[in-house]
Amino acid sequence: MEVDKKDEREAESSEQVVNPWEVSAKDGGKIDYDKLIDKFGCQRLDESLIDRVQRLTSRQPHVFLRRSVFFAHRDFNEILDAYERGDKFYLYTGRGPSSEALHLGHLIPFMFTKYLQEAFKVPLVIQLTDDEKSIWKNLSVEESQRLARENAKDIIACGFDVTKTFIFSDFDYVGGAFYKNMVKVGKCVTLNKAMGIFGFSGEDPIAKLSFPPVQAVPSFPSSFPHLFPGKDNLRCLIPCAIDQDPYFRMTRDVAPRLGYSKPALIESTFFPALQGENGKMSASDPNSAIYVTDSAKDIKNKINRYAFSGGQDSIEKHRELGANLEVDIPVKYLSFFLEDDSELEHIKKEYGEGRMLTGEVKKRLTEVLTEIVERHRRARAAVTDEMVDAFMAVRPLPSMFE
């Protein structure tokens, strides 16, 4: 019996792990997103939905939609059905502030959420989970709050509309109607269920057990009486990475029992580390990530030294066999950030058939990322403490649906 259990544990440890706190592929391979869709029970975002987005918004779908960066969903079709009938919705996304500066992987949900806000003309709430990071990263409450404000500046620099956006820190905002919803959610979820969903153990502090309702209830409009009074049936759409799915599986399970609509989700793949696709970019390993604070020299150095290449060992071999695009990180990064579809296809063809060399692809990636980081740095430098206060002020947003 003991041997069976040991085999089971070893089998589990060699499987991919995807949860809000850990992302790692099986035996150093790639994340299997089809397997994740089956395991989590979400649906693949297909061409028909992307075409509907284009038709309803009268603008080209975002590059993250066109290239399946956002690839899975829950009830996104229902959000579009309602929108087509003239019913609006609101957006909810968030950030766990655990580092001074954001890396490019952190920017992805915000870049996409900004597009959704502009395309559909809807309000947005952004949760800064400074409480979560204080618990999981063992940061002091004060340090977590400071990082939340610093991260808010990076988020604001993405270009959100202050007349349609409310940013809040959990330490500052939780209370009142928000807290009432937390208690309602907490009463619906047993300890066994929470341990099953989130993998909590008897060694974890009870603070961890209390957190999931905090991330759940921003998807209920009644948690924001200053924004949505009398709009308890307003639907919520959550753009996030797929590792956040467990929180919202729980939320969707309890929402109907509380008389609320289930939140809809649109979920992204992970932005891979420079060294390869067996996990996601990590703020704890500075060489695995490109930061928004990196200089042009830093970016060039990191790409040239650390970006895993699918090119061959020698020029002769490369000319003959071409690059392996499946594992090539510079090509992966270009597929996230190079806007021009035809240029991307050209690079893939030339590089994949050996006519373009690794150095040329890395040079183009360096140009693209340097421009994005420089643009972000300029925008962030213009964000003042007064602007942060304005986004975080508890206030109505009278023109939020215009």
Swiss-Prot record:
Native source organism of the sequence: Arabidopsis thaliana
EC number: 6.1.1.2
GO biological process: post-embryonic development; reproductive structure development; tryptophanyl-tRNA aminoacylation
Catalysed reactions listed for this entry: tRNA(Trp) + L-tryptophan + ATP = L-tryptophyl-tRNA(Trp) + AMP + diphosphate + H(+)
Recorded family membership: Belongs to the class-I aminoacyl-tRNA synthetase family.
Motif extent ('HIGH' region): 97-106
Motif ('KMSKS' region): 280-284
S-S bridge residues: none
Name of the featured protein: Tryptophan--tRNA ligase, cytoplasmic
Subcellular location: Cytoplasm, Cytosol
A single GO molecular function term of this UniProt record: ATP binding
Top-level class of the enzyme under EC nomenclature: ligase
Annotated InterPro entries: aa-tRNA-synth_I_CS, aa-tRNA-synth_Ic, Rossmann-like_a/b/a_fold, Trp-tRNA-ligase
Spans traversing the lipid bilayer: none
Gene Ontology, cellular component aspect: cytosol
UniProtKB keywords: Aminoacyl-tRNA synthetase, ATP-binding, Cytoplasm, Ligase, Nucleotide-binding, Protein biosynthesis
Entry keyword Nucleotide-binding: yes
